A protein has these predicted regions:
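Short, glycine/charged-enriched secondary-structure capping and boundary segments
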Residues: 29, 53-56, 93-100, 123-125
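PLP-dependent aminotransferase-like
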Residues: 1-89
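Short, function-defining helix-loop hinge/capping sites that tune catalysis or transport
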Residues: 23, 51, 90-94, 121, ...
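Active-site PLP attachment segment
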Residues: 86-88, 103-152, 179-182
Length: 238
C-alpha cells in the first residue's frame, strides 16, 4: 500500500471470501472499472491464489480497460501483479503442468526479508513474463532506474574501464541489493530445498496436533489434482 501511495494511485481493497484465505473473486470482478490498471493478488502463507480465475476475470473485463502507457497497451488488459512475498519457490498447477509462481502473473514480487523462507536480511526480487513488443533488457533497465535513484548505470558497470560517466534521468528510489546480500541469498538458494522439507515436517506435526480441535487453517498441503494450488512454501502457519 505504501508504494502505491507514493505514486498516488487510487487503491481499492477486496476482502477475503468467507471461509477462505483468498480474495473474494466475485467481489474482484464487480470492482473492476474503466480506471482499473492493476490487480495485486496476495499469496498468503505461500499458497498461490487462483490465477486462472483472475486471468479469466480480466479477460472478461477487457473492454473496460483504458491503457495509459506503452506497457499497458502491449498487455491490453488489466495487469496482474502478484504479491508473492511469502511464496518464493511455490508452484501452480495449470493444465496439468507445474509452473513456478514467478512465471504465472504478469509481474511477481518476492521478499527476502529476515523472516521469510529465503532471506538476504533485506531485499527481494521481481520477475515478469515476456511482454510482446518489449525486450526483457528494456524492462530490466526500467526497474534498475527505479531501484537506484534513476541512475543509468549500476555500480558494477560504473567500475568498468572508462565507464564512470552516468546520468540521473528520473527522481526514483534507493532499494538496490548489495553484493553482500546477494552472497547470502546464493547460499540460501543452495539450502532451500532442505529448508522447505524441514518446514513441511514441522507443519505436519502442527496439523496432527490441531486436527482434533476443529480449527480452520490455511491449506498448507493440498491435493495436487486441484486446479490451481500445487505446492506452497509454508513461511507461516495460520
Amino acid at each position: 500500500v505504501g508504494s502505491e501511495m507514493c505514486i498516488r494511485d487510487r487503491l481499492k481493497f477486496i476482502d477475503v471470501a468467507p471461509d477462505s484465505f483468498e480474495m473474494d473473486y466475485e467481489a474482484l470482478e464487480a470492482a473492476i472499472t474503466e480506471k482499473t490498471k492493476v490487480i495485486v493478488p496476495v499469496d498468503i502463507a505461500g499458497v498461490p491464489c487462483d490465477y486462472d480465475r483472475i486471468f479469466d476475470i480480466v479477460e472478461r473485463k477487457k473492454a473496460l480497460f483504458h491503457p495509459s502507457n506503452d506497457v499497458q497497451r502491449a498487455i491490453g488488459r488489466v495487469i496482474v501483479a502478484a504479491d508473492s512475498a511469502h511464496a518464493f519457490g511455490a508452484s501452480y498447477m495449470r493444465d496439468g503442468e507445474r509452473i513456478m509462481c514467478g512465471n504465472v502473473a504478469d509481474f511477481t514480487s518476492f521478499s527476502f526479508h529476515a523472516v521469510k523462507n529465503l532471506t538476504t536480511a533485506e531485499g527481494g526480487a521481481l520477475t515478469w513474463r515476456p511482454i510482446e513488443g518489449f525486450d526483457d533488457e528494456y524492462i530490466y533497465k526500467q526497474f534498475m532506474l527505479l531501484s537506484l535513484h534513476g541512475q543509468t548505470k549500476d555500480a558494477l558497470h560504473k567500475n568498468g574501464l572508462g565507464n564512470w560517466e552516468y546520468d540521473i534521468v528520473a527522481p526514483s528510489y534507493k532499494c538496490n541489493m548489495t553484493d553482500i546480500q546477494a552472497a547470502i541469498g546464493l547460499v540460501q538458494l543452495d539450502r532451500y530445498d532442505g529448508l522447505l522439507k524441514r518446514r513441511r515436517n514441522i507443519i505436519e506435526r502442527y496439523d496432527t496436533a490441531f486436527k482434533p480441535l476443529g480449527l480452520l487453517t490455511v491449506p498448507h498441503f493440498t491435493d495436487l489434482s486441484l486446479i490451481h494450488i500445487s505446492e506452497p512454501t509454508r513461511p507461516l502457519y495460520i
